[in-house]
UniProtKB/Swiss-Prot annotation:
Its EC number is 3.2.1.8. It comes from the Bacteria. Residues 512-833 form the GH10 domain. This is Endo-1,4-beta-xylanase Z. The keyword Hydrolase applies. It comes from Acetivibrio thermocellus (strain ATCC 27405 / DSM 1237 / JCM 9322 / NBRC 103400 / NCIMB 10682 / NRRL B-4536 / VPI 7372) (Clostridium thermocellum). Residues 424-492 form the Dockerin domain. GO terms for molecular function: carbohydrate binding; endo-1,4-beta-xylanase activity; xylan endo-1,3-beta-xylosidase activity. It is an enzyme of class 3 (hydrolase).
């Protein structure tokens, strides 16, 4: 049947109860119709999907934003799913389509059970990216959806990532946004379903800037629906008429007597789901899902990282006080599946971090919900649902790789779990199995913890040197101390039987220290110790300064000579002379060099700050600067501060700067991508102050970097500037340690980049210097204890030359040598920390 004849027949249907005008696509064989009674009601015997609450960091708003995700019945990470992004109306929220009358999850459950659609995932964002109904929020939400939410979903759920498995639909304001986002991003969406579109709908010439050419070529389904009594009917009708005039295939459905409410929106969704399914949304993409890699049982397994689920009530929840994620709203009979758990030579105990206001049981079964029972954790009350504690139980010995089922016999919140696994016969600490415990094993553990080369099987079991049931930075610290002979046995070896190694390990003695300088001890501990330098000093204007610099430090960084105004004082005129001199000094003295900094809101030349830029022209300036500078120093600078001090001090988004104000919120993504292209081997850092401990600004930067990693932005590390005031408390120092550890969990290196500890001039120097020494020592110990911390750079080394008095009146003496080049107590304290004291 020709399209012309088909259209004529459909016009005849206009006399029916549901007024219908359709210009049909060949991929949509069915016609819209009113759904049967009970289509949106929970039915007995119908498997139910799960609706989970999520939060993600948005680069558009520089904040954490909420959304909800519908996972279909039987959701499994072994399968791939298509995704519908379903938008709410003005003044609404991410809850409306599930709890505000929409019942989208129930509609989908029933359609899946009837075989009318294949299982898919539905995501309901909060579209108020500036504020409810605020116009700027429309543009912000587009960036939020495309640059943050979609990448988050694709990183955390088993979904297809191509346009032909992605749809967008919405009601009222969300209908207008479906038009706007869908039709102007046809490289992202093939199925678009505006229902009762609101006045925020773009004009036709903006929706179809090419006269409809892309829509004709790329659209798999454009479904437009509205009620005949809806005062907003004209907005969808306008688009419909344009499509008719320009031969754009679409479906236009009017519900006779329908208003602006869920009596139209739910039938619209019911039809859109089926027509999108028929048009190919949920077709098999023929993309095989790889078999999950075995997960070692003795590592910490996050509860939310399950591979299968049977429950519609379980939700991913926040875990106080750390702010992580866990599983809650569990009911009796629910179970979670964790595939390919490697129990190694034998697991004999189970440990979980749980919260429970009452008591309940968790059954541990293998390879099925009714499979072999290996143990039961009797969960004791922790007092309330927000108080978590570790609880353990013994289990029957289990070996090899099995699927684990946690079968719940009552409510409980669970953060993570792990198993106690017997150690390998080749001995703790001998990660490469060569019979020796030495720096090669330490490097292997460091690469594992950084996510560069994950350990598996026997090697991972041997890495648990403190026998805690997980492999983390504590094991790195213990192994390092063992290799340096600070300790002579691993924790627990005196009271826990360890199998005799087949080859007796020969312990490597502490590395030979070729001198007595800080750099000698730092090299033995595997870290770099450095200082910033200003041009006159590495130009040998002060011989004493120069002598200390080359003797004590293994890394240098220009204080000012490699900032934008110094390197490119006039557009396209670069001056590398001073930076090159420091590099030559470093190379002569066996030092490494950090690059500081490519992008900053300060110390920019006037031609840049006063220029008449638009987004594209300023991006070109940015790319040219980063590419030219990094290419000049390619292979010679090991760490680059790509961007410096970009977060507002409040933590509420990026600070105002020429980069943010002209390019937009995504300018950092471009900067890091340009940097990686210029020098693929350099480590790329974001550097900032007041982000060392846990707090609003620190949390904002962490969430920003985590989001960048999830989106594939090539960032390797974060620089903690560490400009401190003397007298840091143990609690404050512990907070720094916690912050470093959370970066390790997402595979991010931490460098201490600009350390100084300023002292109030009113304090007694003798007492203050000792407090300062203790603070420096604790900072070094924190860095040594964390394998993702390998750089310890001070912002100068002598109180004779420091920026502090001129910037912080009433403060001084921040460094480790006094003004006469005498080592202060802080110098010796750092050395003691490096020696393991």
């Amino acid at each position: 049947m020709s399209r012309k004849l088909f259209s004529v027949l459909l016009v005849g249907l206009m006399l029916m109860t549901s007024l219908l005008v359709t210009i049909s696509s060949t991929s949509a064989a069915s016609l819209p119709t009113m759904p049967p009674s009970g289509y949106d009601q929970v039915r007995n015997g119908v498997p139910r999907g799960q609706v989970v609450n999520i939060s993600y960091f948005s680069t558009a708003t520089n904040s954490t934003r909420p959304a909800r995700v519908y996972l279909p019945p039987g959701y499994s990470k072994d399968k791939k799913y298509s995704v519908l992004y379903l938008l709410h109306g003005i003044g609404g929220s991410e809850n409306d389509w599930f709890e505000g009358g929409g019942r989208a999850n129930v509609i989908a459950d029933n359609l899946i059970a009837e075989g009318k659609i294949k299982p898919l995932i539905i995501v309901t964002p909060n579209t108020n990216a500036a504020g409810p109904g605020i116009a700027d929020g429309y543009e912000n939400f587009t960036k939020d959806l495309l640059n943050s939410l979609i990448p988050y979903i694709e990183s955390n759920y088993s979904v297809y990532t191509d346009r032909e498995h992605r749809a967008i639909a919405g009601l009222s304001m969300g209908g207008g946004q479906s038009f706007n986002i869908g039709l102007t991003n046809l490289d992202k969406f093939a199925y678009i379903g505006p229902i009762s579109a609101a006045p925020n709908t773009y004009p036709n010439e903006r929706l179809f800037p090419d006269g409809g050419k892309a829509a004709r070529e790329k659209l798999k389904l454009l479904f437009i629906a509205c009620g005949t009594n809806d005062s907003l009917i004209g907005f969808g009708q306008r688009v419909h008429e344009y499509c008719v005039a320009n031969n754009i295939n679409h479906v236009y459905w009017l519900i006779q007597g329908g208003g602006h409410d869920f009596n139209v929106w739910k039938p619209g969704l019911w039809n859109f789901l089926q027509m999108a399914d028929e048009a190919g949304l949920t077709r098999d993409g023929n993309t095989p899902v790889p078999t999950p890699s075995p997960k070692p049982a003795n590592t910490r397994i996050e509860a939310e990282d399950y591979d299968g689920i049977n429950s519609s009530s379980i939700e991913i929840i926040g875990v106080p006080p750390e702010g992580g994620r866990g599983i809650g709203y569990i009911t009796s009979g629910d179970y979670l599946v964790y595939k390919s758990i490697d129990f190694g030579n034998g697991a004999t105990s189970f440990k979980a971090k749980v919260a429970n206001a009452n008591t309940s049981n968790i059954e541990l079964r293998l390879n099925g919900p009714n499979g072999t029972l290996i143990g039961t954790l009797s969960v004791k009350s922790t007092g309330d649902w927000n108080t978590y504690e570790e609880q353990t139980c013994s289990i029957s010995k289990v070996t090899g790789i099995n699927d684990l089922y946690l079968v719940f016999k009552g409510p409980v919140n669970i953060d993570w779990f792990t198993f106690g696994v017997e150690s390998s016969s080749t001995g703790l600490g001998d990660l490469n199995g060569d019979g020796n415990i030495n720096s090669s094993d330490l490097q292997a553990l460091k690469r594992h913890l950084l996510g560069i080369s994950p350990l598996t099987g026997e090697a991972l079991l041997r890495a648990d040197v403190n026998r805690s049931g997980k492999v983390d930075s504590t094991d790195y610290s213990v192994l390092k101390r063992y290799i340096l002979r600070i300790i002579t046995e691993f924790p627990g070896q005196g009271d826990v039987q360890t199998p005799n190694p087949s080859v007796t390990p020969t312990q490597t003695p502490i590395p030979t220290i070729s001198g007595n300088a800080l750099r000698d001890y730092a090299e033995a501990r595997g870290i770099k110790i450095g200082t910033c330098v200003n041009y006159p000093f590495y130009n040998n204007s002060d011989p004493t300064y120069n002598s200390i610099l080359q003797r004590e430090f293994s890394m240098v960084v220009c204080e000012n000579e490699m900032k934008f105004d110094a390197l490119q004082p006039r557009q396209n005129v670069f001056d590398f002379s001073k930076g090159d001199q420091l590099l030559a000094f470093a190379e002569r003295n066996g030092m490494q060099m950090r690059g500081h900094t490519l992008i900053w809101h300060n110390q920019n030349p006037s031609w840049l700050t006063n220029g008449n830029w638009n987004r594209d022209s300023l991006l070109a300036v940015m790319k040219n600067h980063i590419t030219t500078v990094m290419t000049h120093y390619k292979g010679k600078i090991v760490e680059w501060d790509v961007a410096n001090e970009c977060m507002d001090d409040s933590g509420n988004g990026l600070r105002s700067s020429i980069w943010r104000n002209v390019i937009g919120q995504d300018y950092l993504d471009y900067a890091f991508r340009y940097a990686r292209e210029a020098d693929p081997d350099a480590l790329l850092f974001y550097n900032d102050y007041n982000i060392e401990d846990l707090g609003p600004k620190s949390n904002a930067v962490f969430n920003m970097i985590k989001s960048m990693k999830e989106r594939g932005v090539p960032i390797d590390g974060v620089g903690f500037q560490c400009h401190f005031i003397n007298g840091m408390s143990p609690e404050y120092l512990a907070s720094i340690d916690q912050n470093i550890k959370r970066y390790a969990e997402i595979g991010v290196i931490v460098s201490f980049t600009e350390i100084d500890i300023r002292i109030p001039q009113s304090e007694n120097p003798a007492t203050a210097f000792q407090v300062q020494a203790n603070n420096y020592k604790e900072l070094m110990k924190i860095c040594l204890a964390n394998p993702n911390c390998n750089t310890f750079v001070m912002w100068g080394f002598t109180d004779k030359y420091t920026w502090i008095p001129g910037t912080f009146p009433g403060y001084g003496n921040p460094l480790i040598y006094d003004s006469n080049y005498n080592p202060k107590p802080a110098y010796n304290a750092i050395k003691e920390a490096l020696m393991g004291y």
